[in-house]
Curated annotation (Swiss-Prot):
Family the UniProt entry places it in: Belongs to the FeoC family.
Listed GO MF terms: DNA binding; iron ion binding; iron-sulfur cluster binding
Gene3D superfamilies in UniProt: Winged helix-like DNA-binding domain superfamily/Winged helix DNA-binding domain
Pfam families documented for this protein: FeoC
Binding-site residues for iron-sulfur cluster, renumbered to this chain: 56, 61, 64, 70
Residue ranges of the TM segments: none
InterPro entries: FeoC (IPR023732), Tscrpt_reg_HTH_FeoC (IPR015102), WH-like_DNA-bd_sf (IPR036388), WH_DNA-bd_sf (IPR036390)
Name the record gives this protein: Probable [Fe-S]-dependent transcriptional repressor
Residue ranges the record marks as coiled coil: none
Keyword set, alphabetical order: DNA-binding, Iron, Iron-sulfur, Metal-binding, Repressor, Transcription, Transcription regulation
Superkingdom as given in the UniProt entry: Bacteria
Annotated source species: Escherichia coli O45:K1 (strain S88 / ExPEC)
NCBIfam families per record: PRK15431.1
Amino acid sequence: MASLIQVRDLLALRGRMEAAQISQTLNTPQPMINAMLKQLESMGKAVRIQEEPDGCLSGSCKSCPEGKACLHEWWALR
């Protein structure tokens, strides 16, 4: 089980990462990582970076049946 400090340190070392990458690297369940990232965000230590839907090269994101599931959400330190 990872700690809040380990999540922060990993973001410091890697720059920006997705929650799934952090979960896999630290061998911690993703819901726990999501909660830790939200805590870091509320403390002003981390920032959420979301891709814009206009970044889709094929233009098929708007009609995607998964509804923006292809858009990535990154996390980085402030």
